[in-house]
Design a protein with these regions (language model features):
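Q-loop/switch helix immediately C-terminal to the Walker
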Residues: 85, 91-104
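Conserved ABC transporter NBD signature motif
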Residues: 63-77
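Conserved ABC ATPase signature
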Residues: 132-136
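Conserved ABC ATPase "signature" region
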Residues: 99, 103, 111-128
């Protein structure tokens, strides 16, 4: 049986304010089991801010965020992230972009090539690997962004507005 901290994400009394405006106010939740979870709320409710704090992209003002019993820091977690704002390099070939992101995540070249081919086949984007991103539909660009998020086999994948632009 796995220990309690094997898959434990905990946010406890987390808050964030931007220039006097409260973006996240004392949010608490925990996830103890693998699965698909969602943050629901209206526009401006703080979902993206919560995600960015959880990933260590922005600092929280107060509270605790832990993964497997350790305080979350951008450098000490193996998370994948698909941001709401899509970011592909329009003139760069998809394969080159994938290699770049794999390198950023510390993957060995052979492992990166294997992962790129595996995920391109799985997501049905093999034919686009040698094309620049600007030639792809928004939906296929989003699939490429998803590949970037999972290429390094992260322990946790966080998706922000994951289905916008997909069929």
């Amino acid at each position: 049986m796995k220990g309690k901290n094997e898959m434990s994400l905990v946010l406890k009394n987390v808050s964030k304010t931007f220039v006097g405006k409260v973006a996240v106010d004392n949010i608490s939740f925990s996830i103890e089991k693998p699965g698909v979870y969602g943050l629901l709320g209206t526009n401006g409710a703080g979902k993206t801010t919560t995600i960015r704090m959880l990933l260590g992209i922005i600092k929280k003002d107060s509270g605790e965020i832990t993964w497997k019993g350790k305080e979350v820091d951008r450098e000490n977690v193996n998370f994948g992230y698909l941001p709401e704002e899509r970011g592909v390099y329009p003139k760069t070939k998809i394969y080159d972009q994938m290699m770049y992101f794999a390198e950023l995540k510390g993957m060995k070249k052979d492992d990166a090539i294997t992962a790129i081919n595996k995920w391109a086949k799985e997501l049905k984007v093999e034919e686009y690997l040698q094309m620049p991103a600007e030639k792809l539909s928004k939906g296929n660009q989003q699939k490429i962004q998803f590949m970037n998020a999972i290429i390094h086999n992260p322990e946790l994948v966080v998706l922000d507005e994951p289905f916008s632009g997909l069929d």
